[in-house]
Amino acid sequence: MTRKLVLLRHGQSQWNLDNRFTGWVDVDLTEQGRQEAAAAGKLMKDEGLQFDVAYTSVLKRAIHTLQGALKELDQDWLPVHKSWRLNERHYGGLQGLDKAETAAKHGEEQVKIWRRSYDIPPPAMDVTDPGHPGHDRRYATLDRNALPGTESLATTLVRVLPYWHDAIAPQLKAGQTVLVTAHGNSLRALYKYLNDISNAQILELNIPTGIPLLFELDDNLRVQSYRYLGDPEAAKRAAEAVANQGKAK
């Protein structure tokens, strides 16, 4: 039996538009982002996808993307589970900074390493910083010292995988069709795990906003196929635009 999983990166956020490092900062969608969410829902509807359960992060840009997509699908009633483990990678001291200005200051290669390498985190945010998640009450039940002040993709994967194994994978194994609406790097982490690609290969992977990525999995959740819904060239262009965000102007 083929299991279906869709990974959907949130639509354009205000800080995507402003070309700023966002991380765990709770920035909302732009009007374009809301349109992308609806368009993603239409693509999934045209594909004939009937979901059984959905998962998202605790950040509004992902939550609102999921809501917009489900409305277009006419599946607003779907059970939705939110977890901080699906949050974007924490960008530490880079959060809020302009990506192009940071590239001009530190060099495009260094910014590419911070953005796209597997195991090198950006400079950390101190736990005493008001922007640290330890001061945000949505994480009040968690150990403040266990919350990240920065993350690499490797540590993001370590954070995401327990939720995959404990919450998402059992639903897929039970034959459920699953939608995960999250963020560029939490989804890159899942992509790496599912496709078992190398640390070097993940450096070149960019996930565009608002375009559903459909996986077909076997009974053991091994990948049989995967593809972006809609126009493949449009998805390619959107991914290239993501890659160019870290370049100096």
Swiss-Prot record:
Keywords: Gluconeogenesis, Glycolysis, Isomerase
NCBIfam families: pgm_1, PRK14115.1
Isomerase recorded as keyword: yes
Active site per the UniProt annotation: 10, 88
A GO MF label: phosphoglycerate mutase activity
UniProt KW Transport keyword: no
GN (gene name): gpmA
Subunit structure: Homodimer.
Reaction(s) the record says it catalyses: (2R)-2-phosphoglycerate = (2R)-3-phosphoglycerate
Residues the UniProt record annotates as site (Transition state stabilizer): 183
Record-linked Pfam families: His_Phos_1
Highest rank taxon of the organism: Bacteria
Family matches, as InterPro entries: His_Pase_superF_clade-1, His_PPase_superfam, PG/BPGM_mutase_AS, Phosphogly_mut1
EC number: 5.4.2.11
Enzyme's top EC category: isomerase
Family as reported in the entry's similarity comment: Belongs to the phosphoglycerate mutase family. BPG-dependent PGAM subfamily.
GO BP terms: gluconeogenesis; glycolytic process
Summary of the function given for this chain in its UniProt record: Catalyzes the interconversion of 2-phosphoglycerate and 3-phosphoglycerate.
Annotated residues for binding of substrate: 9-16, 22-23, 61, 88-91, 99, 115-116, 184-185
Protein name stated in the entry: 2,3-bisphosphoglycerate-dependent phosphoglycerate mutase
